[in-house]
Structure formats: C-alpha cells, structure tokens
Amino acid sequence: VPLTLEDFEREALPTLETYATIPCQSPGYDPEWATNGHLERATELLAEFALSRNFEAADVTIHRLEGRTPVLCVTIEATTDDEETDDDRGTVLLYGHLDKQPPLLPWSEGLHPYTPVRRGDRLFARGVADDGYSTFAALLAVEAMENDGIPHPRCVILIEASEESGSPDLEAYLDYLKPKLGQVELMICLDSGALTYDRLWVTTSLRGALHAQLTIDVLERGVHSGLASGVVPSSFRVLRQLLDRIENADTGEIVLEELHCEIPEAVHIAAAAVAAEFGDVAAADMPLVAGLRTLGDSDADRIVRRTWKPTLSVTGMDGIPHVDAAGNVLRPFTSVVLSLRLPPAVDAERAVKAVRDALTTDVPHGARVSADVQAADGWSSPELAPWLAEAVQVASQDAFGKPAGFTGEGGTIPFLASLGKRYPGVQFVATGVLGPHSNAHGIDEMLDLPTAVGVTNAVATILEAFTTRNDQ
C-alpha cells in the first residue's frame, strides 16, 4: 500500500517541522558549530525519530569522531523470504544530509528560515528540501515495506552533517564505517534535483565544486583617496586582473584549460531531448529582472552549460564598506569568496592547482595575496543495470503516474564521487525534491510535500526490485 500524503503528515511532518526550527548551519558557515550544539541537536532529533520507527531489526547510532561533525547511521537488517543471508545480496546505502545553508535573510513576508510555514501542500523553511526530508523518506520507505510484508535488503541510512561545506568529514567517516557498511551494491542519494514535480527524476551527472577565499592587500591601513589614488594600485583592480586569468569577463567562459573536459555527445543528445519535451528548464525557474538576456544559444545549450561547463561566481566579499558608509578612502584590502563549478569529469586536485597558480603567481604590482583553495570532484552516473533501469521506470509510474526523467544537475554532492571510487561497479540512483521554486540555498526554500511522498514510494519500489533482481 503506497504511503499517502496523510501518512507523511502524521508520521513525519511534526518532527520535520521541529527540525526546521534548528539553525544547524553547515560548519563552513558556522565556526561555532561545535559549541552551540545546533548540528548535534538536529542529529539527535533525527536519531530519536529513527528509534521511534517499528523495524524488525535495526540499529540507530550517532557516530562522533574527534573534531568532526556527527553522522547518523541507521542499519536496518534484511527481511527475506528465502535462505539467503544479507551478504548474499549486498547492502543498499541511502544517503542524505542534515546541515543547512545560511539563512540568507530577509525572506518573503510571512516566511522565515527557521519558522516552518505550511501553504497548501508546500512547506517553507531552510533545509526542509535540502536535505531535511531525506531521513524521513528513507526510514518511511523501509518501514512501509516491513508493514506490508514486502522483503527488503539490508539498508544503511547515512545522514551526514557537513555536506553543504563540501563534506570535509565524509572520507574519515567512510573509513571508520567501512565494516558497518558492508558490501554496498546500490547507492540511493536523496539530495538531488527534479526538473518537474510530476515524475521521478534521476540525476545522470553532477558538477564538482571549487571554493577559494582570496585576499588582496595593498596598504597597511586605508588612505585618503585623493592622496593614494594614482600612486597605490587599487586592491579591487588587482582582483579584477586576477579574475581575468580565470574567466573571460565578456563571455563568462572559463579560460583555464584544466577546468574543462570533453563533453560526451550523449550529453548533447540528452539535453536536446529534455529541452524538446520540457522547454527552457535551465532558465525557467530563474527570477530574472526584466530585460535580462540569459546565456546560451538555445534551451538545450543552457542545459549543457549548467551541467557540463565550468563557471565562476563571486559569492562573498569583505573589505568594502556599505554604500551609505563609503568614505573617500583607498581601501587597504579586498577579500572575496569564489565559487567555481567544475564539469563532472574534471579532476578537482588539478583544478585546485590551476586556480591557485592563477591567483598567486606574478601578482600585479606585487600586491600581497593569500588564497585558500579547496575542491570536490564531480560525478557521472554509470549506466544503469537492466534490472535497475526497469525498476526506476516502474517506481516513477507507480509513484507519480509518469515515466522517469533523466538529467544532469549543476550542483555538487561529494559523496557520490567518493563512493564510486570506493566501490567500483556500484549502482547509483540519485534523485530528490529540488524542483521548480524549491529555492535551495536561496530565500523561501520550499518542500513540495506530494513530491516527498512520491520519492518515498519510489525508493520502496527500487528496494523491492533490488531484493528480487537478476544480476544478468
């Protein structure tokens, strides 16, 4: 019996709304995370929810490694109707995260990042779609199977708390939890996107991410601009010169060859097919100002640009006063945070070296520059095994009434690339609820509740297919 919206409202929504009130920002945005306890409180809340579920055999454990964010691990042993053991069929690893992006105030009238608001079938709050719902979807999917007497495989639900910071704690936990994970045969990631809310969307690729914090110093202190300008180079101009080494300011194209990769012809074909059926999906959800011209030559080209091309965004800046407090001063420094998205096949370490060298070698005018550069690899899904390809279609039809969709995404989930390296040959289903107007990372983040229910039911269908699969 499929899970209904009423089931989700009764079983999951109260705890999800409590989670929404916790300002559990990812450690990269909250240097006091270890002392303020927000991530710990969110982890304990989700662990309590897991303990409240009715499984035949399950272990719920919060793991805490010194100096690292906590990880929630729920192991649910297989229920089978034959003589096979857990090891005979392998483990399904279900992944999500509980850390949140910064609140990014102000939100729209009547909404607040840490005050959940229900409007129709949509829940507004920071982190509910990215990725708070995932713990509930994974647990309820397995529980529904047990309630209906449907055999399921051994499942390990792994919920981390540093994903939004690039998952710096992930590798240590994967090493630590290796014995508990067992032989992972299928990985289901619930942190990805959806182009529409009418079907299950499966992610075929994700871009990598490079994060750089750059500071340019030209003076020990600010000086009257009438005295210093024309003599001392502006730190902002030096910044512009350095950024020109990375990006062509006229076109937005990245000029460092290390940040590019060959784009498979299949990507162009798939993008054209998605654009033909669904239109300009890459730009349709953007709150563009009137008259703005988007990049790209066509709907399909914009899909490719968003998923397989490198890009640069300046996401933060220091050293510049607010406009109403700006005096006639040549400022001593400029600091920026650079966010670069890397194509799925680009090597992150090679990209880090190229960007660091571009920012710190032969700096104009001999300005003092410091650059902290880190990156995470992108990911491209292996071809689905026949049984899984069929299961995904059945899951979408049963849960949504329409065939599954397949598309690349422009974001980053470091866990997928990491797991693919650790378990060669593992099968992946990356999906999620981040569809139109879900506003992940932005103001007014929203979870479409019927989609959360649909994804939950789809997961159950895929788990059932895993149990009965033929690995030919």
Where are these regions (language model features)?
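N-terminal helical capping/dimerization or prosegment-like subdomains
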Residues: 2-106, 333, 337
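Active-site metal-coordination/substrate-binding segment of hydrolases
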Residues: 52, 83-159, 454
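Acidic, glycine-rich active-site loops and adjacent beta-strand->loop/helix elements
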Residues: 67, 98-100, 158-167, 190-195, ...
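Acidic/histidine-rich catalytic neighborhood of metal-dependent amide-processing enzymes
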Residues: 127-205, 471
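A short core secondary-structure module
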Residues: 172, 229-250
